Amino acid sequence: MSGLLRFAKKMRAWGHVPRDLGRIVRSYRQRTKDGSVCYHNWYPCNDYEDEWFHRFIVRNVGTDHRYHFFSVFGSRIALAMPVQNKVFVSGENVHIPNASAEIYQDYALDKVNLSLGYDDIQDERYIRFPYWLLYMFEPVIDRKMIRERIDEINRAENTRKFDCALIASHDQWNMRSPMYEALKDHLDISCAGKWKHNTDDLWTIYNNDKYRYLSEFKFNICAENFDTPLYVTEKLFDAFRCGTIPLYAGAGNQPELEIVNQDAVLLWKKEQSDHSAFIQEVLRLARDEAYYDKFVRQVRLLPYTEEFVYEKFTLLKERLMKMARA
């Protein structure tokens, strides 16, 4: 703890407010019981043991060393802590102007041993590691398990009980409103989140089980919060795993080209002024069962997905073990 005390004195010399110091000291308590992972500026979490990265380390790396995982939910001052084995992770879009995560658009590469994010950056300290990997795959380096998961997603079917689902807390950057307005008079859109909320079924009937809920719908409006190339979150993959057709906007109209079958997604191209072709395609799918069958049974994840996931997991293991040996 002496290193932390020296760091605290340095912070006071810099004139930083006590709140920053308190946050950093408290972050030392945000660690797993085995001591292998300590979280700083991290996502809200009820169980640090069950966090994906901790489970990855337990299963693939071992718990002999402590790793410090940092994210975007706090001051960059935390990155200056005198600790070893620093890993920065961003599942957020760091390129939204004036958003809080923008201060991390460099992925803290000069402050950590390893950084993970959505962007394609050529740096030995960086791995492109999109956050949807954590939602779709267990933290196990096993080709068979990865292949089985891909097959499961490709075979997923929805019940077609309802028209269209939309689950969102906001639309601050106007990514969802245009699509919603264009379709609301043609489809019954169930808005189960805070934004445009018109149903409590997600909670009262499905006990907040988002996947069981989405699997009841023909379509899912799953636009990103902001349109940035390469930024594809779990939203698109949630639609796939639930067997529903994603009505997607984001990623510069090119969501994970090596992974996602673009023909299995209906893309709302926000830069276009005329969306009549998109609307007509949705309506045909909604009304023509045979046409819907043909569309929804397409392969969603391309063959390269297995290699992509396996390579990312293997590389993460290698980098974590290498930094611990340094």
Across the structure, where does each feature detected by a protein language model lie?
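Pol beta-like nucleotidyltransferase catalytic core
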Residues: G3-S90, N98-A326
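Acidic, polar ligand-binding/catalytic clefts
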Residues: N93
